[in-house]
Amino acid sequence: MELEYESKRPLYIPYAGPILLEFPLLNKGSAFTNDERNHFNLHGLLPEAVETIEEQAERAYRQYQDFKNDDDKHIYLRNIQDTNETLFYRLLEAHLSEMMPIIYTPTVGEACEHFSDIYRRARGLFISYPNREHIDDMLQNATKQNVKVIVVTDGERILGLGDQGIGGMGIPIGKLSLYTACGGISPAYTLPVVLDVGTNNPQRLNDPLYMGWRHPRISGDEYYAFVDEFIQAVKRRWPNVLLQFEDFAQKNATPLLNRYRDELCCFNDDIQGTAAVTLGSLIAASHAAGSQLRDQTVTFLGAGSAGCGIAEQIIAQMMSEGLSEIQARARIFMVDRFGLLTDKLPNLLDFQSKLVQKSDDLHHWNLHNDAISLLDVVRNAKPTVLIGVSGQPGLFTEELIREMHSHCARPIVMPLSNPTSRVEARPEDIINWTDGAALVATGSPFPPVSYKEKLYPIAQCNNSYIFPGIGLGVLASGASRVTDGMLMAASRALAESSPLARHGEGALLPNIDDIQAVSKAIAMRVGQAAQLQGVAIVTSEEALSKAIEHNYWQPQYRSYKRTSF
């Protein structure tokens, strides 16, 4: 039976007694009214007092504060989510900036590493390779019937932690929590999925409590055939769903995106979401400095799918500001573990080969080795923007940052690797090394830096600024695809919300507590772009705005009426 969750009208429920209390989407706990307790056989199953959701949230927050470490806080919040989802999101709404780092990065990394140890209750779908002949049946088994947003991972590249097997399920769960908390997408319409294709992590394979398929990862044609079976089954079950690929390994992420982006409504957050939020931040930073992105020279540490995805978005924006493609690409320098990507490097991936520098253009550089290091690039290319997506901590050294500052009065430094333990440099060090001149944005949350009696806000360049608004915009507009134009629109909407760009002071990105308003603004731009590009029905701006508000779920209890099957 399908329940209609969006309306403000009473909800007709076929469940009663203990079964109703076990249904997280419907459970109100002590907030069931006396009338509801009569009709749903709940008397005796709950304490006498009838509470409001505000009273429940106050108790939950007090309990939350009793936990002293972040891992325990994460487990506690997940337990509330698996007991009473409306209360969970009401609690998040009241304490979003405090709790977002607990339910997602950086704490979710630990939760993924210890997924099998802290496992308490099933959430989402575990699609395992040994059961590949039953994928359609598994999708039918989902407790949610009208799924509109899926986040799927195969657990191979979880944050900067590598292969976590089914432990990677923590990421789709956390990501979808933010779709709801930040983008207002009803939890009744979200589904986390992990594709269990084995693991090459010996710690997981040798862990007696590991709950996944104990087998080396499948790969090649076998792997792609399995993913395709899943995608085709999703299309049969929920043909209009928005599917987000999450934390797939570099070797698979881009091929999967390229294969399916024109087949169903999908995107890859690591490639496209990261690019969109980074681009939005850079546009805002450029405007705050009185310039355009076309004026910047950008160096990347990390030339994987995420780094190259960001670079391509930057190039597209530079071209929209008047540069030719050749001119724009000449301003991008990609560095990986083998050094600067040039046309002489062998074995480059397809998406890397478009971002190489021509060796003939570097003959005037002062070099001492064949491999061109990050420091060589900073000394010779003199970048104004430095972006880290390497997953390797500490590589933005004092020497490197001081060298950058020697030729750039206001350097933009963005160590984006997650979790915090993998960050390329700590904001406090960057501020100190540049005498307070650097504009810093990070992937994980950091507190403001105090330097010479001045407080420097550190922007968290987190995808959560982008993907909830994209999801809301897709659902509100009915978009059938996620296009590059929709992603560009999201970046520009984010840039326009920057306090620094708008007022010349303050943080580069809005406060997390304002993210719901930001998501609605992004949703409007995304929906308009979808209409312009022909992947959504054209409506008036007023109609789209009403659709966004209609689709925006609020964590409030609805009244229930009893019905029968």
UniProtKB/Swiss-Prot annotation:
Disulfide bonds: none annotated. The active site is at 104 (proton donor), 175 (proton acceptor). InterPro entries: Aminoacid_DH-like_N_sf (IPR046346), Malic_enzyme_CS (IPR015884), Malic_N_dom (IPR012301), Malic_N_dom_sf (IPR037062), Malic_NAD-bd (IPR012302), Malic_OxRdtase (IPR001891), NAD(P)-bd_dom_sf (IPR036291), NAD_malic_enz_proteobac (IPR023667). It comes from the Bacteria. NAD(+) binds at residues 157, 270, 418. It catalyses: (S)-malate + NAD(+) = pyruvate + CO2 + NADH; oxaloacetate + H(+) = pyruvate + CO2. Keywords: Metal-binding, NAD, Oxidoreductase. Belongs to the malic enzymes family. Homotetramer. This is NAD-dependent malic enzyme. It comes from Yersinia pestis.
